[in-house]
Design a protein with these regions (language model features):
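Zn-dependent metallopeptidase/amidohydrolase metal-coordination segment
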Residues: 227-230, 291-292, 561-612
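A short beta-alpha structural unit
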Residues: 238-243, 475-484, 496-498, 502-503, ...
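His/Asp/Glu-rich mid-to-C-terminal helical/loop segments that flank catalytic regions of hydrolases
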Residues: 421, 439, 443-468, 511, ...
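Acidic/His- and Gly-rich active-site-bordering loop/insert found
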Residues: 214-301
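Aromatic-anchored, charged helix-turn/loop surface patch used as a conserved interaction hotspot
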Residues: 41-44, 52, 56-58, 63-143, ...
Length: 625
């Protein structure tokens, strides 16, 4: 609901004095903090003095910070933030509701009567809520009333937003309207998450830190999102598909930024990948390969893929500014295509790097009849040079990729970073069940050959079967009754199957059970089925030594170590075929939604990601000396 100054998980590098990191993230104190406190002061102060230092973080609720002091000494501000999250998580629903109800409404009575706390006044002012038009004020007042009537507590939103500069009034009203339709349990949790974000920014004010590199990464993504394909751009939607004008503009912009960061070599290769190389201290040394993709799905988010380009770019920028070289090089690749939106050629960019570019792709046509070959020629790319892109794995230490989680898990557990254990193996099918179309009024229930009901029974089985594994997933994403009619028992039902699991063996066991159940259902119901396998991808378990490096980096930052599989496919899957790989996930906001305009993360979490990446670089430096 309200919020404070420029936020920063970047506090953590200052907080633990970068003892674990030789490359130091740089922050600047915000102007609002005259005398910032230090983590050393907080850790060594008498309990009552330490509590006073943290006063004002949680609205009229000092007990949260006071109880968190039991966890002293804190390794970092990230450690302190999580300790406070844990206090509230275990406080019980009544205490949580008490905290929420201690917050004033947005542009509410307390603002009008000037009885807000200093922190809330600052935050609501920065969001422009003290300068509403009569129409805006009336709209927000009505939303306040509607929200309170539905949920029984005030709407809470961190109005300083993901970068800490403030949401505008239109964004605030949109969030208000969207969340008004939420489930009460979800809304309670979302209010608490926003309170923690408010506190994060207030805490950074107190310690006089900003996530400077997190801001840099955030800004790059905002600027790159200015480029979007026609039709979508006019609607304010982000869509960048392979080799469109917007796609090529993105490549040029990334190339320009790489040069600004201090990369020694920058090129756009024969498939449109943007490649930046930062040379090692001595010639002939291996390179660390990293990166992700810059294309998007239609009407997608700003962070999917692109986060994994800009985080290592920020690290190279820092190395260059410090005049530092490592005993290995860094190669950052902004992969031109991963999503398979314009052409059916998923992982085209990373596939080319491992020699898996399929020549038949060149003859594929997009929706306008333009072949990939023609699109490449129009973009000035030389298809004859594609084989030259293939990398020799012997020249690389391995591949690491950072990525927004694209799921709700980190968001729900209030942990900013997650270490990926494996990229799930998957199988996809297009299926159809064939029964008998008959009159809906005259066909008794026990004499029907209902194709749709057979699929429905299978869907319920899949839901239960996948849940038994804990980390398998099973989805029927497409479901259609061809030529269906309101008064006809469905005679045909076409549907898709998407089955995924962290290991191939677990995936194959899931597939076997689902197929056996499909056969059993059809036998019992007197219907028949067809299934065509359309895709099979092997699981990509993280290389143990690389996963361990991410784990050490996360732990060094004072962030709880949380491990999870990746349900989505990533460029790391392709590199896994030729070299060791491991991934790091960053928490997403808005329930972790992705492939959606609501996809978001904060400067603070991105700063933590930069710091973790930096820590991995320093580990490698120690190992390769």
């Amino acid at each position: 609901m309200q919020e404070a100054a420029p936020a920063a998980e970047s506090s953590r590098p200052e907080a633990h004095s970068c003892k674990h990191t030789n490359i130091r993230p740089q922050g600047r104190p915000p102007t609002e903090t005259a005398m910032p406190i230090t983590l050393e002061q907080l850790n060594s102060a008498r309990r009552e003095d330490a509590a006073q230092m943290l006063d004002g973080l949680y609205e009229h609720s000092p007990w949260i910070a006071e109880q968190a002091l039991n966890e002293r000494p804190f390794k970092s501000l990230a450690h302190l933030k999580h300790a406070m999250c844990e206090v509230l998580a275990h406080a019980g629903r009544d205490a949580q509701l008490g905290l929420i109800r201690a917050h004033p409404e947005l542009a509410g009575k307390a603002m009008v009567s000037k009885t807000l706390t200093a922190e809330s006044t600052n935050e609501q002012t920065k969001a422009g809520l003290t300068d509403c038009t009569p129409e805006e004020f009336a709209k927000i007042q009505q939303l306040n009333a509607d929200y309170n009537a539905k949920f029984g507590w005030p709407f809470i939103l961190a109005v300083r937003g993901p970068r800490g500069v403030g949401l505008n009034k239109a964004q605030i009203i949109e969030a208000f309207e969207r969340r008004l339709h939420g489930h009460p349990d979800f809304e309670l949790a979302e209010c608490l998450r926003n309170i923690h974000r408010i506190v994060e920014i207030r805490l950074n004010d107190k310690f006089g830190v900003e996530p400077t590199l997190g801001h840099q990464v955030w800004d790059w993504q905002e600027k790159l999102a200015q480029h979007s394909d026609p039709d979508f751009a006019e609607k304010g939607q982000l869509t960048v598909t392979y080799l469109t004008d917007a796609h090529r503009a993105c490549a040029q912009r990334i190339s320009h930024w790489m040069k600004d960061c201090g990369f020694d070599e920058v090129e756009i290769d024969a498939v449109g990948n943007v490649v930046g190389r930062y040379h090692p201290a001595a010639a002939g040394q291996k390179y660390l390969l990293t990166g992700s993709h810059y294309d998007t799905v239609r009407n997608g988010g700003k962070y999917d893929g692109r986060l994994g380009i800009f985080v290592p770019m920020a690290c190279v920028q820092q190395l260059h500014q410090q005049g530092k070289r490592l005993p290995f090089g860094i190669e950052v690749v902004a992969f031109a295509e991963e999503e398979g939106q314009r052409y059916k050629a998923t992982f085209l960019g990373s596939g080319a790097l491992i020699g898996d570019f399929k020549p038949e792709w060149l003859d594929q046509k997009d929706a306008d009849g333009i072949t990939m070959r023609a699109a490449m020629q129009h973009a000035g790319l030389c298809t004859d040079d594609i084989p030259k892109i293939q990398r020799d794995p012997a020249h690389y230490l391995g591949f690491i990729e950072v990525h927004i989680e694209q799921g709700p898990v980190l968001n729900e557990v209030n942990i900013p970073l997650g270490v990926v254990t494996s990229i799930n193996g998957s199988v996809r099918y297009l299926c159809e069940i064939i029964g008998t179309a008959s009159h809906a009024g005259t066909t008794p229930m026990d004499r029907r050959r209902d194709a749709a009901c057979a699929v429905a029974e299978l869907a319920l089985y899949m839901e239960q079967r996948a849940a038994k594994d804990g980390d398998s997933v099973a989805t029927i994403g497409q479901l259609q009754v061809p030529n269906g009619s309101i008064n006809v028992v469905p005679g045909r039902c076409s549907f898709s199957l998407d089955l995924r699991a962290p290991t191939d063996a677990q995936r194959d066991a899931l597939v076997a059970d689902v197929m056996a159940q499909l056969h059993s259902i059809c036998e019992r119901r007197g219907v028949r089925y067809t299934c065509e396998e359309t895709m099979r991808a092997a699981a990509a378990p993280s290389a143990p030594e690389w996963q361990a490096r991410w784990e050490r980096a996360v732990s060094a930052l004072g962030v709880p170590l949380f491990k999870l599989p990746s349900g989505a496919g990533h460029d790391a899957m392709k590199l896994h075929e030729v070299m060791p790989q491991a991934m790091l996930f960053v928490r997403g906001e808005n329930a972790g939604i992705s492939h959606n305009p609501l996809e978001s993360t904060t400067s603070d979490d991105m700063q933590l990601c930069v710091d973790a990446f930096t820590h991995v670089l320093n580990q490698l430096e120690q190992e390769t000396r």
